[in-house]
From Swiss-Prot:
Signal peptide: none annotated. Its cofactor is pyridoxal 5'-phosphate. Transmembrane segments: none annotated. It catalyses: L-histidinol phosphate + 2-oxoglutarate = 3-(imidazol-4-yl)-2-oxopropyl phosphate + L-glutamate. Belongs to the class-II pyridoxal-phosphate-dependent aminotransferase family. Histidinol-phosphate aminotransferase subfamily. Keywords: Amino-acid biosynthesis, Aminotransferase, Histidine biosynthesis, Pyridoxal phosphate, Transferase. This is Histidinol-phosphate aminotransferase 1. It comes from the Bacteria. The modification N6-(pyridoxal phosphate)lysine is found at K210. PROSITE patterns: AA_TRANSFER_CLASS_2 (PS00599). Pfam families: Aminotran_1_2.
């Protein structure tokens, strides 16, 4: 430990991102990236911005991107906040809205950045257990709190909370902010964005990383009542005035303008998810219902960590979590049909081989 570290840094437990291996010939199914390329219109927009304009700072407010997002979701531009990926947007939301006198609430099995933000910003929190079937039970959140935050679909389980349940939570929990983290909503769920004009304490956060194939561009955004958005803007203005570069802004605008490519990509992933889920079930895996671009699975007779290691030996990377309740599960990104077939073939050999042993 370095003697120059502050007490805050000494006590931090940073988020550990999914591995980005520097190897060739990998079937990479560990970080929920889209297996298909971005829209050609996005690539054309980025190429068009490559030139002398890069000597200039980008628009600090990214107004063109805010307007594109507002048009898509049917809200005002003053109801949109943009940031350098949804993680940055979440970080600003924790600072701006969730540092209250009462603890905030989030699921015990959820996106592991939430407790990291709480540690970094000294935010009191309590975790709420998921049910035995890994579902969020709304009534467990109907108690005094400093805010509620959860992903929908949940990560890493992929389970979807119906929009009607979110509406119930918002109706009965009006004294604190509710943040719905919708990184995966485009793969089968109904967005809570439809509720932002009815509930002034709702903030919806989304990303272009997953359904729009732009994880490398880093664009996230929030939708909410203008007062909530202003709070995020105040934090942003105290941290980084230019979170989005010129390429991210024009690429993001083009992504929202090309609805045909977006629809094709997400439909392909949803079809492959169903096909992959059936194949895994035929191999004896328990497959949780998923509305995301990944599946969460375990095998009743085979250890999760051992399966992940054996797949890695075959140059197939999936995500394994050494956490209570889910240490036997694998989170598997939905890749192309070809990638998923390679995975199924490898698992078939492993399951059969271990059963014979």
């Amino acid at each position: 430990m370095n003697p120059y570290w502050s007490a805050l840094v000494r006590d931090l437990k940073p988020y550990v991102p999914g591995e980005q291996p520097k190897l060739d010939n990998l079937v990479k199914l560990n970080t929920n990236e889209n297996p298909y390329p971005p829209s050609p219109k996005v690539l054309a927009a980025i190429r068009g911005e490559l030139g002398a304009s890069l000597r200039l700072y980008p628009d600090p407010n990214a107004e063109l991107l805010k307007q594109a997002i507002a048009r898509y979701h049917g809200v005002g531009a003053n109801q949109v906040f943009v940031g350098n990926g949804s993680d940055e947007v979440l970080a600003h939301a924790f600072q701006a809205l969730l540092k209250q006198t009462r603890p905030i609430l989030f699921p015990d099995i959820t996106y592991s950045f939430y407790p990291v933000y709480c540690g970094l910003y000294d935010i009191a929190h309590e975790t709420v257990p998921l049910t035995e079937s890994f579902e969020i039970r709304i009534e467990d959140y109907l108690r005094p709190n400093g805010g509620v935050v959860f992903p929908n679909p949940n990560a890493p389980t992929g389970r979807l909370l119906p929009l009607a349940d979110i509406e119930t939570l918002l109706s009965k929990n009006r004294d604190s902010v509710v943040i719905v983290d919708e990184a995966y909503i485009d793969f089968g769920g109904e967005s809570a964005a439809a509720l932002v004009n009815r509930f002034p304490h709702l903030l919806v956060i989304q990303t272009l990383s997953k359904s729009r194939s732009l994880a490398g561009l880093r664009v996230g955004f929030a939708l909410g009542e203008p007062g909530l958005i202003e709070a995020l803007e105040r934090v942003k203005g105290s941290f980084n005035s230019y979170p989005l570069d010129r390429l991210a802004i024009v690429g993001g605008v083009a992504a929202f303008d090309d609805r045909d490519h977006f629809e094709w990509s997400r439909q392909a992933i949803m079809w492959t998810r169903q096909w992959l889920s059936r194949g895994l079930a035929e191999l004896g895996f328990e497959v949780l219902p998923s509305a995301a671009n990944f599946v969460f699975v375990r095998h009743p007779r085979h250890d999760g960590a051992e399966l992940a290691a054996a797949l890695r030996d075959r140059h197939i990377i999936v995500r394994h979590f050494k956490l209570p309740r889910i240490d036997q599960f694998l989170r598997i990104t939905v890749g192309t049909e070809g990638e998923c077939q390679i995975l199924l073939d490898a698992l078939s050999e492993l399951v059969a081989g271990q059963a014979a042993a």
